[in-house]
C-alpha cells in the first residue's frame, strides 16, 4: 500500500472512532437497551446527542447510580474514551515535534496536566486510583488496574509505527489506568 493511501486509511480509522464515540455520548454509561432505543426514537442513531439527552439528562452507570457522567459536554463531544485517543494523538504530535520517543514516563505529565486542568469527562474508579498512585510516587510499572483493559486508546500510533510488536507494546502502555 502506498504511503498516501495508508495515511488516508489511518486518518479514517482515527476520525471514525471519534465520530462513533461522539454518537455514543448521549447514552454513554446507560445499560438499559430499551431506554437507549427509546431515547433514539426507536430507530438507529441519526444525530449526536448531549449526555443523557432524551433520557432526562442522566444515564445509569452500574454501581454509580443515575447521573450526568459528562457534565459540560455537548452533542458531538466525546466520552472519556474519545478524550483518551485525542490525548494520545496530542502527545505523539508533541513527541514528534520535539524529536522524542514516546514513553509512558513522557506521557504522564501531559496526562496529569489534562486531568488536573481540563479533563471534562467522567473519571472512572481506576483512573482516580491511578492518579492517587502517581501522586504517591508508585512506580509506573505498578500503577493502574484492570478497568480499561478493553479501552482502545492507541489508534493514532498506526501513523507512526508498523511493527506489530511495537504497536502492541504501545497499546499496553497507554492502558495505564
Regions found by a protein language model. Give the residues of each.
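Structured, active/binding-site neighborhoods that engage oxygen-rich ligands
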Residues: 1-177
Amino acid at each position: 500500500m502506498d504511503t498516501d493511501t495508508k495515511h488516508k486509511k489511518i486518518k479514517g480509522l482515527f476520525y471514525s472512532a471519534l465520530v462513533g464515540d461522539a454518537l455514543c455520548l448521549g447514552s454513554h454509561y446507560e445499560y438499559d437497551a430499551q431506554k437507549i432505543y427509546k431515547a433514539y426514537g426507536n430507530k438507529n442513531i441519526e444525530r449526536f446527542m448531549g449526555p443523557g439527552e432524551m433520557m432526562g439528562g442522566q444515564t445509569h452507570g452500574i454501581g454509580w447510580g443515575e447521573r450526568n457522567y459528562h457534565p459540560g459536554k455537548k452533542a458531538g463531544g466525546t466520552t472519556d474514551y474519545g478524550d483518551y485517543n485525542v490525548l494520545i494523538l496530542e502527545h505523539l504530535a508533541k513527541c514528534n515535534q520535539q524529536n522524542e520517543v514516546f514513553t509512558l514516563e513522557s506521557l504522564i505529565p501531559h496526562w496529569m496536566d489534562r486531568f488536573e486542568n481540563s479533563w471534562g469527562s467522567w473519571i472512572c474508579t481506576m483512573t482516580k486510583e491511578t492518579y492517587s498512585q502517581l501522586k504517591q510516587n508508585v512506580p509506573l510499572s505498578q500503577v493502574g488496574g484492570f478497568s480499561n483493559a478493553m479501552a482502545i486508546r492507541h489508534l493514532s500510533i498506526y501513523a507512526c509505527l508498523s511493527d506489530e510488536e511495537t504497536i502492541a507494546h504501545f497499546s499496553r502502555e497507554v492502558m495505564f489506568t
